[in-house]
Design a protein with these regions (language model features):
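Alpha-helical transmembrane segments in multi-pass membrane proteins
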Residues: 3-4, 8, 12, 30-35, ...
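C-terminal ends of transmembrane helices
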Residues: 6-24, 76-91, 134-147, 189-193
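Transmembrane alpha-helix boundary signature
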Residues: 10-21, 36-53, 118-119
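Cytoplasmic-side transmembrane-helix entry/capping segments in multi-pass membrane proteins
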Residues: 19-31, 91-101, 148-156
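Loop-to-transmembrane alpha-helix initiation sites
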Residues: 57-67, 123-127, 169-185
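Mobile "lid/hinge" segments at catalytic clefts and subdomain interfaces of large enzymes
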Residues: 143, 157-201
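Membrane-interfacial segments at transmembrane helix termini in multi-pass membrane proteins
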Residues: 180-237
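Structured cytosolic domains appended to multi-pass membrane proteins
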Residues: 218-316
Length: 317
């Protein structure tokens, strides 16, 4: 425990805020791998005295824990690769990918039936391999723009993996905390998909049920600007909304934005921040950056709180 805590503390302190999404994905992978190891260990060395219904329940706990854990592990590894730039952020679209996903799930369920029918541990090992491949394929098929949802989704999976492990070990605390993490991650993923006008099932299965429709024509005219023009607009504006995105994190510009906000407010102008649910690379990314730069919390608003104010705003950055 001490060694792990020290290593984790050192890694967390050395990681910059721009690398936090990758760290979160890596930590999710550890939870999934731990669930796989614990489940397989419990199969190799089962508790004594189990028979009848108790034995079947124990086998279900092993199977579910290993299945979710394996998906979480490989999915998180791919998410880490995409977020860090090691892997291409474009979705991998294999022919018949949806049928492939369904096939892997059905085969895993059949192997679970065989496993509980005392067919042997080989069914668990084969299912583990399939779940590893399923996790890889599922996240590889999701594009980089949906990565915030993927991180939240993997957070949910890691929670359910922990809960399944809690049932396996008879640990009530692990069950409760895992269920809380799993449920909150699932709800957050749904909220983020709704904010993106995306279908939740479509995102997590890498385009399930989506079709390519006619391209929407952009209305209006795009006008280029420069620093001088923006500075002049800000001086003349009384009501200003700043909408931060991942570019602020990459440029580490949160302190400069905070200083700009301080000066504008000192001139008597109203400055507020509008936070989109999927801004950045993980949930709450922009909120953490702005808090780090000491931007007042009361002017940082969620999309639903400020969306109706845009038509009456003088300038939006």
């Amino acid at each position: 425990l001490v060694v792990g805590a020290v290593i984790g503390g050192i890694v967390a302190m050395r990681v910059e805020m721009t690398g936090m999404p990758q760290l979160v994905a890596a930590l999710h992978s550890f939870v999934g791998l731990a669930a796989v190891f614990i489940g397989i260990n419990s199969d190799i060395v089962p508790p004594e005295g189990l028979a009848g219904a108790e034995k079947i329940i124990h086998e279900v706990e092993i199977f579910v824990g290993v299945f979710i854990g394996a998906i979480t592990f490989t999915g998180s590894v791919v998410a880490y690769g995409k977020l860090s730039g090691v892997l291409d952020g474009k979705p991998l679209t294999l022919p018949g990918r949806n049928l492939l996903n369904v096939g892997m799930v059905l085969i895993s369920l059949y192997l679970g039936y065989l496993y509980m029918g005392h067919a042997g541990s080989w069914t668990l090992w084969v299912m583990t391999a399939i779940a590893f491949i399923f996790g890889l394929h599922m996240v590889l098929a999701i594009g980089g723009a949906d990565m915030p949802v993927v991180v939240s989704m993997l957070n949910s999976y890691s929670g359910w993996a922990a809960a399944a492990t809690g049932f396996l070990l008879g640990n009530d605390l692990l069950i409760v905390t895992g269920a809380l993490v799993g449920a909150s991650g699932a709800i957050l993923s749904y909220i983020m998909c709704k904010a993106m006008n995306r279908n939740f099932i479509s995102v997590i299965f890498g385009g399930w049920g989506t079709t390519t429709g006619p391209q929407i024509e952009v209305e209006g005219e795009m006008i280029a600007t420069d620093v001088t023009t923006v500075s002049s607009d800000l001086k003349e504006a009384n009501d200003i909304i700043i909408v931060p995105g991942y570019g602020m994190a990459v440029a580490q510009a949160q302190s400069a934005v905070s200083e700009l906000t301080r000066r504008l407010r000192g001139m008597g102008k109203q400055v507020r921040f509008a936070i989109h649910p999927v801004a950045g690379r993980l949930p709450g990314h922009m909120n953490v950056l702005l808090a780090e730069a000491k931007v007042p919390y009361d002017i940082v608003l969620e999309m639903d709180e400020i969306n109706d104010d845009f038509p009456n705003t003088d300038t939006v950055i």
